[in-house]
Amino acid sequence: MSFSGQISAKPHFRVTSIKRLRKQVSLMTHTAEQFINLKDYPIDQDNAERSSLLASVRRDLQNDGCAVLKNFLTKQGVEALVSEADSVSQQAHKSFNRTNVYFTKDDPTLPRNDPRRQFFDRSNSFIPADNFVPDGPLRQVHNFVGFETFIKDALQEPRFYRYADPLADVIVNMAEEGNGFPWHFDTNNFTVTLALQNADAGGEFEYAPAIRKEGENFQEVSRVLNGTSDKVVSLRLEPGDLQLFRGRYSLHRVAPLFGKTPRYVAIFSYVEEPNMVGAPERTKQLYGRVLPIHLQRAGLRADAYID
């Protein structure tokens, strides 16, 4: 019986691989111009409309570190990126553990109520960047002429580089029913995300704007964690929405999710230093593996925050 099981496994694998390959080839027949809503968001143009759009995004970022471009993707774009995410969803690294805001280990020398000692259940999945082919929909959007320049101009950062991490420069977060993603800070300074698919219920994006812009601000972090902060904003992102967010300074989370439909969000990461990659421990937590480059470049960061 075990012998026949081994024989049937190979044909099944080949059929699955062929189906996945055909789907990827089909997705590559379209272009980024069909995926991005260039009528409302002329990011590749040098005109008054683009200037007005930039001014609006900059105001939002200045106010609370978050800007949302509704319906940035076309309907066709949403469908293509969701289909691509579905085709590689089995490659997601699923993790179920307990983490603190900083993804660091417990430090028993600190007071018990210190936010560095507050740990929460985490259930989440990330599809690493090396699963998305160069000509696929996600990377077509990422590499579209004008996309990266628009993001840089919106953020108004003189030092702006695409994240060099081969597992994390552009990924898809796949969140299934459960606790979502608890409160945390991003290790990269600027995060750009595309909402692709919502869960059946829940999954709101919640954040406390810029609470550690001038320092760690442990007191306000504690208030967010215990539910007494008045700084928390709740945001409902719809499929196709583009979000620019300063996650290095703003504590944020994905609220608990409900239902069988996974929540897909594409994440594009940019940083202030060239050649930056994730810290080995954080990378292992999020993607289930590290590459030699993570060990070689460990510690390459300009700021002094604890994560």
Model-found features: residue ranges?
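Catalytic core of non-heme Fe(II) oxygenases with the double-stranded beta-helix
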Residues: 134-139, 148-242
